[in-house]
Swiss-Prot record:
Stated role: Converts sphingomyelin to ceramide. Exists as two enzymatic forms that arise from alternative trafficking of a single protein precursor, one that is targeted to the endolysosomal compartment, whereas the other is released extracellularly. However, in response to various forms of stress, lysosomal exocytosis may represent a major source of the secretory form.
EC number(s) recorded for this UniProt protein: 3.1.4.12, 3.1.4.3
Regulation of its function: Hydrolysis of liposomal sphingomyelin is stimulated by incorporation of diacylglycerol (DAG), ceramide and free fatty acids into the liposomal membranes. Phosphatidylcholine hydrolysis is inhibited by incorporation of cholesterol, ceramide, DAG, monoacylglycerol and fatty acids. Antidepressants, namely amitriptyline, imipramine, desipramine, fluoxetine, sertraline, escitalopram, and maprotiline inhibit sphingomyelin phosphodiesterase activity. (Microbial infection) The secretory form is activated by P.aeruginosa, this activation results in the release of ceramide in the outer leaflet of the plasma membrane.
Quaternary structure (record): Monomer. Interacts with SORT1; the interaction is required for SMPD1 targeting to lysosomes.
Glycosylation sites: N88, N177, N337, N397, N505, N522
Source taxon at top rank: Eukaryota
Impact upon substituting P186L: In NPDA; reduces enzyme activity; intermediate form with clinical features of both Niemann-Pick disease types A and B
Catalyzed reaction equations: a sphingomyelin + H2O = phosphocholine + an N-acylsphing-4-enine + H(+); N-(octadecanoyl)-sphing-4-enine-1-phosphocholine + H2O = N-octadecanoylsphing-4-enine + phosphocholine + H(+); 1,2-dihexadecanoyl-sn-glycero-3-phosphocholine + H2O = 1,2-dihexadecanoyl-sn-glycerol + phosphocholine + H(+); a 1,2-diacyl-sn-glycero-3-phosphocholine + H2O = phosphocholine + a 1,2-diacyl-sn-glycerol + H(+)
Cleavage, annotated site positions: D253, L254
UniProt protein name: Sphingomyelin phosphodiesterase
Effect of W393R: In NPDA; intermediate form
Impact noted for substituting S151A: No effect on sphingomyelin phosphodiesterase activity. No effect on subcellular location. No effect on phosphorylation by PRKCD
Outcome after substituting D225A: Does not affect cleavage by CASP7
Amino acid sequence: MPRYGASLRQSCPRSGREQGQDGTAGAPGLLWMGLVLALALALALALALSDSRVLWAPAEAHPLSPQGHPARLHRIVPRLRDVFGWGNLTCPICKGLFTAINLGLKKEPNVARVGSVAIKLCNLLKIAPPAVCQSIVHLFEDDMVEVWRRSVLSPSEACGLLLGSTCGHWDIFSSWNISLPTVPKPPPKPPSPPAPGAPVSRILFLTDLHWDHDYLEGTDPDCADPLCCRRGSGLPPASRPGAGYWGEYSKCDLPLRTLESLLSGLGPAGPFDMVYWTGDIPAHDVWHQTRQDQLRALTTVTALVRKFLGPVPVYPAVGNHESTPVNSFPPPFIEGNHSSRWLYEAMAKAWEPWLPAEALRTLRIGGFYALSPYPGLRLISLNMNFCSRENFWLLINSTDPAGQLQWLVGELQAAEDRGDKVHIIGHIPPGHCLKSWSWNYYRIVARYENTLAAQFFGHTHVDEFEVFYDEETLSRPLAVAFLAPSATTYIGLNPGYRVYQIDGNYSGSSHVVLDHETYILNLTQANIPGAIPHWQLLYRARETYGLPNTLPTAWHNLVYRMRGDMQLFQTFWFLYHKGHPPSEPCGTPCRLATLCAQLSARADSPALCRHLMPDGSLPEAQSLWPRPLFC
């Protein structure tokens, strides 16, 4: 059976060869125009599928060049050049083709023609099985052609993206800056430790639940499709056990019963003062999801959370898998059937019992909101899809989509004026965002370091963090973002959740994180016939890592301790994967790349890792800094 994409926990190479003559009727110019536009669509689909399949990539998978720019497509997917014949696409030919594309799109973009050729390319490049190729092209084609029509990349930008900087400048996501108030920044004031006996709040953190309503015990966990362990996956070979009852260590999501087990078994970890829930409710079957499927997942899992958590307030954030097509989050100026109104309205209805009127108003507009859980604490839920590298709608305009960052500045300034503290929750971590968005966010965090008490994200499915530094020297740790592990097993992990201990609800509270605990379901034990699932404490951060506190400097120091202490790093590596690390060892390049990621809360900023190498060699540190595709 042919295999599509990559094996588990590896990057997904895309390959193929130049398309031969096609018998489709039409002028050669239109044929080539459709072919290259379809190639762009096929590559976008490859990105979407690999984004839904790749949890961890080797350190060498996505290096930065010595200049600090992301690797070009032909470097990220080297086989594309060899088999597709990428070298035959010269710079003049490329610019000529994209000139024809832009002229044609201004006249009459033919979605059906583009989709037909994209399906052929998807099959030719072996991006996915034929049925998946057909389904995902039909799902994406309308939005992708609409985005291309509205954005109309210049030939220089498109060919710079495809062939590298020698052919043109490809940074279509141009630089931009938000405005900060003229109010001077107060002197940095680290939080004081709470007094002995001060109240402590416990916050349950749920992320990346990924419910698969088609999960089926006994099916093939290593099928050819991007998601397995489900109806249609077939039976495994005799040498391989089928999908387990509670989940599987493979490219599989969770049955509803496992989410019910998680929520019903929270008692030993509680009680909880509130819940932060940072999205990704649907499964990774991104090639045939409908809006009805996404809304079903939203309402079903929201009802389940409400059933088991009762009166505990729950504050959600929007994940990248909530929409369909996956990662499709147009800014609010996109209206009509292409807009996200269908999703935001459904979220507002589902979450209305938890959110006040003003929060529901901005949720309906752009998927973000702010509220006050306690006196003195402001919670801000960001729609991180407006920073996403995979949100193709940002090709039209990536400058502060929905005005969200400028709105964030206003919220933080108002909190500073009141003397409040702020928690930020979101799905995609800031270090994984588009460069300009990420750098602006970094600047905002630095400006409001005294006000911003904590940041919480998900998305990567693994257990990590991102340290922020002062912008002047990049040496003083001033904030940390906590990236919690997923509930889903995707890919090859135990199910898990996080609990944060926070300086509690009292006058003068710092509201900072005091410690955190991670709980897992050991699938090896749970899937034994007749076993009762037991959610167990995996570790406590301060105890396990010997941290004096959980302030930014402590996490910075932990990274540099792990640089020289292999045993400590192996502990981190084990916990990073929720107690089920990959069988491949993490050697020195992998270790340094992983540590670099913990220092990189700002995208495309390899200088943050300049001290990781023993000799301080910046080029080497850059080459080890991965930006893998995550779910």
